[in-house]
Amino acid sequence: MSQSAVSFQINSVSKVQEQLIQQKINLKTKPLGALGQLESLALQIARIQGADQPYIANPTMLVFAGDHGIAAEGVSIAPSEVTRQMVQNFAHGGAAINVFCRQVGFKLEVIDCGILTPIEGVKGIIDQRLGAGTGAIHLEPAMALETVDKGFAMARDLIERHHQAGCNLVAFGEMGIGNTSAASAIMAAIMQLDVIDCVGRGTGINQETLARKLMLIELALLLHQSALTGPKEVLACLGGFEIVQMTGAMLAAAERNMLVVVDGFIATAAALVAVTIAPNVRDYLIFAHQSDEQGHLRMLEFLQAKPLLSLGLRLGEGTGAALALPLIQAAVNFYNQMASFSDAGIEAVV
């Protein structure tokens, strides 16, 4: 363990009020379970907040960006330069995530965790660089173990700033050419799966590129096999700067009893690491959607997660998490505002 190791103290969400919360849901003017997954979501949120009137305040979308050494081997449909171009697009408001955040009321913040070349003089990009792209994981570790802890510390400070500003819900998105390779490698290492069960086509690669991607990830796992002794070591050997900071931010948000909305395949890989580090994190995670990346369903099942949406998305950026916000708000609103049978003078049908 590095001398500057960062640790998190995350409480398990109390079940003391669970029966009362469930009773309140059951007594709304509807048949039992008629609001489906919104009911379990309302129960989760009310348990996390421990409040009679749960609420969403200053919802914030954090998009973490970083480049990957493995991308130089052509494992994606786009070169690494596109990461930087998309980060600029985020800053100028032109990406899908910008459109959706404006629509649903998310504050959007973009974090440069380590793209190849920094973007200077552009408002709206937070500098939390850990380097200029990771090492190529099939040849060397992605980063030093100390860099993982540095990323965790940066992420904790980021979350603390938003918590102090009154945010109680944070969603996670990402941008990084090659990061499905890193996420697949992390998944294979932690879940002890064959690489072929973890690797998909990312943003739409062809069969030849997929075969190369599979081979390189298998090489990476073989190269680092003896070093993969824990979740931080998995991040150091196989991860990305953006995945490291997402993981740390999820841990920090759970530590502050915030709601954590997880986007797609890459964000779920970060959640997988976070839960491996601190299992209590799982109580705070809301999984926005099931993406079209083939390994995502396996990860969701491993985490016993039922996502809110299944739209065939495979873009990343936090787009699925943004689209889930109205559903999260609907769960809170029905819990707070919907009449009970006694309030409405209706004979109970429970």
From Swiss-Prot:
InterPro entries with a match to the protein in the record: Nict_dMeBzImd_PRibTrfase, Nict_dMeBzImd_PRibTrfase_bact, Nict_dMeBzImd_PRibTrfase_N, Nict_dMeBzImd_PRibTrfase_sf
A molecular function GO annotation: nicotinate-nucleotide-dimethylbenzimidazole phosphoribosyltransferase activity
Family annotation (SUPFAM superfamilies): Nicotinate mononucleotide:5,6-dimethylbenzimidazole phosphoribosyltransferase (CobT)
Biological process annotations from GO: cobalamin biosynthetic process
Stored Pfam families: DBI_PRT
Residues annotated as catalytic: E317 (proton acceptor)
Superkingdom of this protein's organism: Bacteria
Pathway(s) it belongs to: Nucleoside biosynthesis; alpha-ribazole biosynthesis; alpha-ribazole from 5,6-dimethylbenzimidazole: step 1/2
EC number: 2.4.2.21
Alphabetically ordered keywords of this record: Cobalamin biosynthesis, Glycosyltransferase, Transferase
Catalysed reactions, semicolon-separated: 5,6-dimethylbenzimidazole + nicotinate beta-D-ribonucleotide = alpha-ribazole 5'-phosphate + nicotinate + H(+)
Cross-referenced HAMAP family: CobT
Role summary: Catalyzes the synthesis of alpha-ribazole-5'-phosphate from nicotinate mononucleotide (NAMN) and 5,6-dimethylbenzimidazole (DMB).
Family in the record: Belongs to the CobT family.
Protein known as: Nicotinate-nucleotide--dimethylbenzimidazole phosphoribosyltransferase
Gene name of the encoded protein: cobT
